[in-house]
Curated annotation (Swiss-Prot):
It is found in: Cytoplasm. InterPro entries: Integrase-like_N, TACO1_YebC-like_2nd/3rd_dom, TACO1_YebC_N, Transcrip_reg_TACO1-like, Transcrip_reg_TACO1-like_dom3, YebC-like. One of its GO terms (molecular function) is DNA binding. The keyword Transcription regulation applies. This is Probable transcriptional regulatory protein TC_0742. Residues 1-21 are annotated as: Disordered. Disulfide bonds: none annotated. Residues 9-21 have a biased composition (Basic residues). Pfam families: TACO1_YebC_N (PF20772), Transcrip_reg (PF01709). Belongs to the TACO1 family. Keywords: Cytoplasm, DNA-binding, Transcription, Transcription regulation.
Length: 238
C-alpha cells in the first residue's frame, strides 16, 4: 500500500501523514476548479460540482474557502487542471506510480525529471509499472471511530472486497472502482464514518529490497510527494 514500508520510522510516517492532509485539501480545491470549468459554477445544474462541494465540506474545508475558489474558477484567467500519471522504477526493482493534477503539464514533467536527477530512479513508458498494480476504490475509515473486527463484519455486506489496516490512522475498505459510491453509502447507512473516498492503486506483488535500496526509495518518494502538483505516490515496496 502507498506509504507503507518497513524502512519508514514512526516520525517519518507522522510527517508524511500531516503532509498528506494538506495534499488532500489542495486536491479537492483543484477538483472544484476543474468542475466549474467543465460544467459551470451553479451546483444545482452541475452534479460533479455539487458532489465536490459536499466532499469539501466533509473534509472541513471552510465555506469561505469554497466560495472564494468558486469565484476564482469562474475567472477567465484561471487555467483548468488536468490529471496526469507518471511511472517510475526506483531502486531494487521497486515500481512507483505518481498521480498529479496540474494546470501546467510542462512544469510538472520538469519537476519529475528533477526528482530522478536528484534522488535516482528512472521515468519509464506508460504501462511499464502499472501492470504491477490494480485500480481500486477505497473508503478511508478513521481507526479511532471503530475497531477492526466490527468494521470487517460490514465490509462484505456493503459490497467491499477487502479491508486494509496497514495505515496508522485509517482502515481502507477496498472495492471495485465502479462500486465506490454504493459501498460508501452502505457503510454510512450502517453508521460507519468515511473521512474520504477515492481511487487508489494497490500492488499486485510486493518487492522486498535491502535496507540501502529501501532508504533510497523513501528519499525518492518523499521528494516526489513534495512536488506541488503531486497528489499521490504509490509503490510496491514491502
Amino acid at each position: 500500500m502507498a506509504g507503507h514500508s518497513k524502512w519508514a520510522n514512526t516520525k517519518h510516517r507522522k510527517e508524511r501523514a500531516d503532509h498528506k492532509k494538506g495534499k488532500i485539501f489542495s486536491r479537492t480545491i483543484k477538483e472544484l476548479i476543474s468542475a466549474v470549468k467543465m460544467g459551470g459554477p451553479d451546483p444545482k445544474s452541475n452534479a460533479r460540482l455539487r458532489m465536490i462541494i459536499q466532499k469539501a465540506k466533509d473534509q472541513n474545508i471552510p465555506n469561505e474557502n469554497i466560495e472564494r475558489n468558486l469565484k476564482k474558477a469562474s475567472s477567465a484567467d484561471q487555467k483548468n487542471y488536468e490529471e496526469v500519471t507518471y511511472e517510475l522504477y526506483g531502486f531494487g526493482g521497486v515500481g512507483i506510480i505518481v498521480e498529479a493534477m496540474t494546470d501546467n503539464k510542462n512544469r510538472t514533467a520538469s519537476d519529475m525529471r528533477v526528482a530522478v536527477n536528484k534522488r535516482g530512479g528512472a521515468l519509464v513508458e506508460p504501462g511499464s509499472v502499472l501492470y504491477n498494480f490494480s485500480r481500486k476504490g477505497a473508503c478511508y475509515v478513521p481507526k479511532s471511530s471503530i475497531d477492526e473486527a466490527s468494521l470487517l463484519t460490514h465490509v462484505i455486506d456493503c459490497g467491499g472486497e477487502d479491508l486494509d489496516s496497514e495505515d496508522e490512522e485509517f482502515f481502507l475498505v477496498l472495492c471495485e472502482p465502479t462500486d465506490l459510491a454504493s459501498v460508501k453509502e452502505a457503510l454510512l447507512a450502517k453508521g460507519v464514518t468515511c473521512s474520504e473516498e477515492k481511487m487508489i492503486y494497490v500492488p499486485l506483488r510486493l518487492v522486498d529490497c535491502d535496507e540501502e535500496a529501501g532508504k533510497s526509495n523513501l528519499a525518492l518518494i518523499e521528494w516526489l510527494e513534495n512536488i506541488d502538483d503531486v497528489d499521490d505516490v504509490y509503490h510496491n515496496m514491502t
